[in-house]
A protein has these predicted regions:
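Alpha-helical cap/lid subdomain in secreted, periplasmic
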Residues: 2-4, 42-54, 63, 67-214
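Serine-esterase "nucleophile elbow" of acetyl-processing enzymes
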Residues: 1-58, 73-80
Length: 214
């Protein structure tokens, strides 16, 4: 991916992206949060200092894809981003498996494609970076294993969407699993099976940079 002048990079998703970011503030110490978008923003801001980039985060903790889509006008299109990085899906799988009230995989795909179509209709030059949703079964329960398998299926949907829209796809699950295996402890990567540790966020950011070649 080429990093152009005056890029506006928007990070979107759930709590993994949110990182306890500030709300309604332009305070540069807080508005990005403390998750992988902060690591990426810090790196890219310095590397491309002469290109005057801007970085925004609108991830909201607890959101599934439908909830993100419901606010997409305000938190997506109206911001006029030139690059949009999306990581979403763990709450869709969690609600579907745990409470049987989340989006089905078919609905997930439909909403995702609709969101991209509507964005490109108004911002045709916007580029997407679609990150693979991930999960780890840290408690050994059947429910967690079902959620893990559901996430794997949704990841394949995201990968196919990225291919269809000629977008960048960032694979993460196998990479995170490999680090967990190396350390012999899944919680050192995703402390509760969902949320990355400092190490986990660093792994995600490094992979994002590797795949985008930025």
């Amino acid at each position: 991916m080429q990093f152009k002048n005056n890029e506006i990079l928007l990070f979107q998703g759930d709590s993994i992206t949110d990182g306890n970011r500030g709300r309604g503030t332009t305070d540069p110490n807080h508005y990005i949060g403390h998750s992988f978008p902060y690591i990426l923003s810090a790196h890219l801001a310095l590397k491309y200092i002469d290109k005057n980039p801007s970085f925004l985060s609108r991830g909201i903790s607890g959101n599934d894809l439908l909830q993100m889509y419901a606010r997409w006008r305000e938190d997506g299109i109206n911001l006029k981003p030139t690059v949009i990085s999306i990581l979403i899906g763990t709450n869709d799988a969690g609600a579907y498996i745990n409470a049987n009230n989340g989006s089905t995989q078919k609905q997930y795909e439909h909403i995702f494609r609709t969101l991209i179509d509507e964005t490109l209709n108004e911002l045709p030059d916007t580029r997407f970076v679609l990150c693979e949703p991930f999960y780890m079964n840290v408690d050994g329960t059947d429910t967690s294993e079902r959620r893990y398998n559901d996430i794997k299926s949704r990841a394949q949907i995201v990968k196919k969407i990225a291919e269809d829209y000629n977008s960048t796809y960032v694979p993460l699950q196998d990479l995170l699993d490999s680090y967990a295996k190396k350390l012999g402890n899944k919680r050192k990567i995703l402390w509760d099976g969902v949320h990355p540790t400092i190490l986990g966020h660093s792994i995600i950011a490094e992979q994002w940079l590797k795949i985008t070649e930025l």
